[in-house]
């Protein structure tokens, strides 16, 4: 089809016919690049049987969106097929894969959550694109609305329009979003108190839980029977009010 169109154009320009020497046309076909949201070679947790340890773990934590997570029987082996990371495959084990995706759904990294109760390292974060922030849920939010920021991917599934930081060094300043920071309910943690204070100084809204709430994070609050969405919305503060609430809440 392209060749026929080319010949027709040359004919119109008088550049074809007997005695005419015309160079053969060159067509520059670029190899198409297709984005994918599929996690290669892994099974979504939603497709596992009810008794499977990975599915049982998430369901016991009341996480309903099982399609968002995958089961990986050999984490080191699978990771090395995505990006050479581990020098040895010894002591390989199963983990739940938590994909980190951009707004278009393309995976740029992932976390592996151990299924072993006494694992020394519960979460391992692997970045396939080091230019991206260690953030979970960018594909799940509406950036035109307030975006809640939680401390863990599982916590983000208990409130609407939420992302999660997958590391202590996450910088969200590159995003022009209206953030509401939802740190863990740990008033004796100097680190968390400092993070809440910094968010207030930068003009962000923060969530400061009432003293009646004893659970540490959103997942625990859901397991305890709290309406997490209402709890978060009714305890969101900013400015001077946030600073006063922080002073009342902290224990350090």
Language model features: what each stretch is:
Residues 1-13, 68-83, 88-93, 222-251:
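Short, small/acidic-rich helices and loops at N termini and domain boundaries
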């Amino acid at each position: 089809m392209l060749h026929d169109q080319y010949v027709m154009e040359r004919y119109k320009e008088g550049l074809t016919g007997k005695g005419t020497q015309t160079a053969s046309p060159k067509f520059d076909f670029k190899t198409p690049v297709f984005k994918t949201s599929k996690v290669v070679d892994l099974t979504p947790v939603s497709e596992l049987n009810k008794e499977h340890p990975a599915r049982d773990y998430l369901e016991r934590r009341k996480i309903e969106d099982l399609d968002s997570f995958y089961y990986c029987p050999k984490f080191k082996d699978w990771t090395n097929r995505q990006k050479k990371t581990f020098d040895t495959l010894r002591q390989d084990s199963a983990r739940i894969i938590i994909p980190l995706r951009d707004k278009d759904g393309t995976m740029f990294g992932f976390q592996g959550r151990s299924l072993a109760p006494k694992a020394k390292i519960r979460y391992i974060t692997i970045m396939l694109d080091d230019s991206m922030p260690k953030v979970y849920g960018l594909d799940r939010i509406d950036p035109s609305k307030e975006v809640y920021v939680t401390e863990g991917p599982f916590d983000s599934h208990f409130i609407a329009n939420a992302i999660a930081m997958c590391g202590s060094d996450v910088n969200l300043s590159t995003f022009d979003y209206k953030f509401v920071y939802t740190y863990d309910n740990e008033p004796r943690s100097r680190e968390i108190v400092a993070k809440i204070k910094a968010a207030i100084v930068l003009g962000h809204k923060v969530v400061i839980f009432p003293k009646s709430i004893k659970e540490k994070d959103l997942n625990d609050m859901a397991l305890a029977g709290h309406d997490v969405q209402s709890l978060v919305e009714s305890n969101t503060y900013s400015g001077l009010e946030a600073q006063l609430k922080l002073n009342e809440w902290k224990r350090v």
